[in-house]
Amino acid sequence: NINSIYFDFDKWNIRPDAALELDKVVTLMNKYPGMVIRLESHTDSRAEDEYNMVLSNKRAKSTYDYIISKGINPDRIPKYEGFGESQLVNKCSNGVKCTPAEHQMNRRTEFIILKMK
């Protein structure tokens, strides 16, 4: 199981805590050369749906770019995609009062293992 990484509000840059997790992903992918993953990025519910789709795609791309920059073959990440605010992990949808920590849980990239050899 690979831990999700998290993003600051309205940002898509890789934070230092996320870089540590991504380095673990790279280590794992180097250990298992047949491992293929998909990246799924998300936002919290603040901002317009369309804007959040664009933002989540930028998050997916920055995550992909980081992993590729560490020498992983792009063929091993055949798909990276943003889902905007369509897959919230909690009750924090439009108009619901939530704490900063609750919103943070939704600003994430998840890693789905497609193949493991």
Regions found by a protein language model. Name each.
Residues N1-N3:
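Pro/Ala/Gly-rich low-complexity, hydrophilic intrinsically disordered segments
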Residues E40-K117:
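Periplasmic OmpA-like peptidoglycan-binding domain that tethers envelope proteins to the cell wall
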Residues Y6-S41, Y64-S69, F111-K117:
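Periplasmic peptidoglycan-binding/anchoring modules of Gram-negative envelope and division proteins
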